[in-house]
């Protein structure tokens, strides 16, 4: 382990969750089962679906203690990849709650939700946000670029199973890269009716994608926090289009739908 790597970062201001302190259980080498085309970390360095302990729980909690009295709304597990890949996820969540008493949130791509152990550990959090960008198998491959063996049907089954077991708040987060036609909107409504989330969050990329690993990608920065380092500009929908879509979806399903503020860029 790189002992100089900061596993706790922020606080950052989130339009979704307020003032949030970040916990990174993955570590210095970005590790994920997705390699999303818009990822703010840059290209993922280690593509994997295997769970392991990246940073010992005691090290994370020791660092977290230095942030007392934790004047934040929520403590969020995300960071340098997919947090459910951390085999000590449950220990970390238990430790955070015991140490701080704060609400906990995990941002996940839902690729491991068919694993009963992962679902049990995630259930220790107060809030879970699952990613749903690809509404069809080909979209999943094109936008999220998962590791081999990950299929959309498996992800959807895992989310539905988890929702049936989870007593906290489950939100669906979707990155909208281009305007949706009616077929896409109908498909999204169909999937939401199966998942039955507490809330839907529509997002769009707020900055370019760096071409190499960027630690700054963990924060909620806007603009270009990468200086003169190489980036890829991402074409996406404008804020007003996103807001209009949010109103349509909310009106159709009766579930709260929020979206990134128009002036986020």
UniProtKB/Swiss-Prot annotation:
Cited InterPro entries: Aldolase_TIM, GTPase_Obg, rSAM
Record family assignment: Belongs to the UPF0026 family.
Phylogenetic lineage: Bacteria, Bacillati, Cyanobacteriota, Cyanophyceae, Synechococcales
GO molecular function, one term: metal ion binding
Protein name according to UniProt: UPF0026 protein slr1464
Family matches, as Gene3D superfamilies: Aldolase class I (3.20.20.70)
Cofactor annotation: [4Fe-4S] cluster
Region Disordered: start-end pairs: 204-230
Cofactor mode of binding and number, as noted: Binds 1 [4Fe-4S] cluster. The cluster is coordinated with 3 cysteines and an exchangeable S-adenosyl-L-methionine.
Native source species: Synechocystis sp. (strain ATCC 27184 / PCC 6803 / Kazusa)
């Amino acid at each position: 382990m790189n002992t100089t790597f900061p596993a706790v970062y922020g606080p950052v201001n989130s339009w979704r969750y307020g003032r949030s302190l970040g916990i990174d259980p993955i570590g210095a080498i970005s590790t994920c089962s997705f390699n999303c085309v818009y990822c703010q970390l840059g290209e993922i360095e280690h593509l994997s679906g295997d769970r392991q302990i990246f940073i010992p729980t005691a090290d994370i909690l020791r660092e977290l203690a230095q942030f007392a009295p934790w004047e934040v709304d929520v403590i969020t597990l995300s960071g340098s990849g997919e947090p459910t890949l951390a085999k000590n996820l449950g220990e970390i969540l238990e430790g955070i709650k015991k140490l701080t008493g704060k609400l906990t949130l995990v941002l996940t791509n839902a690729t491991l939700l068919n694993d009963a152990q992962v679902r049990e550990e995630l259930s220790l959090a107060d809030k879970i946000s699952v990613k749903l960008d690809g509404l069809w198998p080909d979209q999943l491959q094109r936008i999220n670029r998962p590791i081999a063996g990950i299929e959309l049907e498996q992800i959807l089954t895992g989310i539905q199973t988890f929702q049936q077991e989870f007593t906290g708040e489950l939100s669906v987060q979707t990155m909208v890269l281009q305007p949706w036609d009616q077929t896409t909107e109908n498909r999204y409504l169909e999937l939401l009716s199966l998942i039955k989330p507490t809330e839907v969050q529509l997002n769009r990329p707020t900055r370019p994608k760096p071409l190499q690993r960027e630690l700054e990608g963990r924060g909620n920065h806007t603009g270009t926090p990468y200086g003169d380092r190489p980036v890829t500009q991402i074409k996406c929908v404008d804020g007003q289009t996103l807001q209009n879509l949010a109103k349509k979806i909310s009106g159709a399903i009766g579930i709260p739908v929020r979206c990134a503020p128009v002036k986020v860029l």
